[in-house]
Amino acid sequence: MKRILQYILRIFSKIILRKYKPEIVAITGSVGKTSAKEAIYQVLGKYFRVRSNKRNYNNEIGVPLTILGIEGGGGSFLLWAKVFLKAIRIIISGGDYPEILVLEMGVDRPGDMAYLTGFVPVDAAVITAIGEFPTHLEFFPEKDELIGEKSILAKSVVKEGLVVLNYDDISVRMMADGLPEGIKTITYGFGEGASIQISNYNFYLSDLDKGDYGATFKLEYEGSIVPFRIEKMIGKQQVFAVAAAAGVGMGFGLNLVEISNAFKKMFNLPGRTNLIKGIKKSWVIDDTYNASPLATI
């Protein structure tokens, strides 16, 4: 049943992508890909018509459903029949399809990334971080095999496309080597060699009860330095997400000031660096969602 669903969804996706020709931003990594996806959506969504994955729609079923803009049918044959009818209507009727799709692409086992990039033409690829102890290693005998699988995304970018890489993660930084000619590469990180350099990171706290806290930092790109002040942001992992989004935003013609204006408040995801009020005047940082060691340290 699953293979049949995959096949049908893949066909519908290819038809819709060929019909509407949206630009596609794809994100992967073992750490921070969902936060990066949300940050990219927040930036691009301010200036373009954009759609991104909802919930955990980042696999061979979820990515096509995001392309279709339809909820899945679960275990119901009748609901899946309705999904396919909706897809046919989208193909026939036309309409106000998004200009840009922001797609998180998860990798659980060998072949996953090759499958997704086999029918999704990627204009901009973002690789967040792998880390020393990455998640999702159950089906990969060695860490290098997982890295190789994720690097397929960078190598699959269309001619004259964009690849955005985490400079501070050596495994990700090295993915810039051997990319096809004509691909533009932007790196981001705290390291001095990053294209987009993060600096002056500080956490401010005025009143937790009133939600008056957040982070300030600066992003520098090609001599331009712009300060960022983002409410309700805690942790450097979210700063990395913003920097990744800045790289994508500039690939779509935005400047750092326009990107900064999209981040007055931080997106909040369940289980990802959220503050929860505890007992005895304590506060708990909830960063528990499928967390890897790198994401929580």
Regions found by a protein language model. Give the residues of each.
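Short beta->alpha connector loops
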Residues: 106-110, 169-170, 290-291
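Short catalytic-loop micro-motif centered on adjacent basic/acidic residues
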Residues: 26, 51-52, 100-104, 163-164, ...
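A conserved segment at the C-terminal end of the G1
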Residues: 27, 35-53
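ATP-dependent carboxylate-amine ligase catalytic core
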Residues: 10, 14-20, 45-148, 235, ...
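Glycine-rich phosphate/pyrophosphate-binding beta-alpha loops
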Residues: 271, 289-296
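Acidic, Mg2+-coordinating active-site environments of NTP-dependent enzymes
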Residues: 20-22, 98-99, 117-118, 122-283
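N-terminal pre-Walker A segment at the start of P-loop NTPase domains
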Residues: 1-10
